[in-house]
């Protein structure tokens, strides 16, 4: 199992990336609203929101607050850190699908939220992250 220093470093990087992207997205959407364009948060961005919250609440917080955790609580930061890494990896593919750069190049017209390929990738990513989280959390030592 990874040491607390490594887990907190990975969670901090994930959180920093997620918060930076969220500020970028909000700024962009406010500008789009001023231009009369539809305003939305792409479904793919919710992967980053979830990864950020998981990193802060299920990795950093337990590492700081629980000094002598045992059993499932001891594995919680590692499970959450692994899941948030999957969420960030899935975000990359999903946001590319949202902008039709990865899948959907033959689609025309305005983008939908979510794009069909984006929706599939987001749900697959969420399922994989949840499965990995559960596996690590419940794995016997």
Name what the model sees in each region.
Residues 1-21:
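Hydrophobic transmembrane alpha-helical segments in integral membrane proteins
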Residues 39-141:
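Alpha-helical transmembrane segments of integral membrane proteins
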Residues 15-31, 89-103:
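Membrane-water interface of transmembrane alpha-helices
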Residues 29-40:
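Cytosolic, membrane-interface loops and tails of multi-pass inner-membrane proteins
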């Amino acid at each position: 199992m990874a040491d607390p220093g490594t887990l907190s470093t990975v969670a901090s990087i994930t959180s920093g990336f997620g918060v930076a992207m969220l500020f970028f997205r909000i700024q962009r959407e406010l500008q789009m609203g001023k231009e009369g364009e539809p305003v939305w948060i792409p479904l793919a961005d919710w992967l980053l929101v979830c990864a950020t919250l998981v990193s802060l609440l299920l990795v950093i917080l337990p590492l700081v607050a629980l000094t002598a955790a045992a059993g499932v609580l001891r594995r919680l930061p590692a499970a959450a850190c692994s899941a948030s890494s999957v969420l960030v990896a899935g975000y990359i593919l999903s946001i590319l699908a949202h902008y039709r750069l990865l899948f959907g190049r033959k689609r025309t017209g305005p983008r939908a939220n979510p794009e069909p390929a984006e929706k599939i990738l987001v749900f697959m990513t969420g399922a994989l992250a949840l499965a990995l989280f559960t596996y690590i959390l419940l794995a016997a030592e």
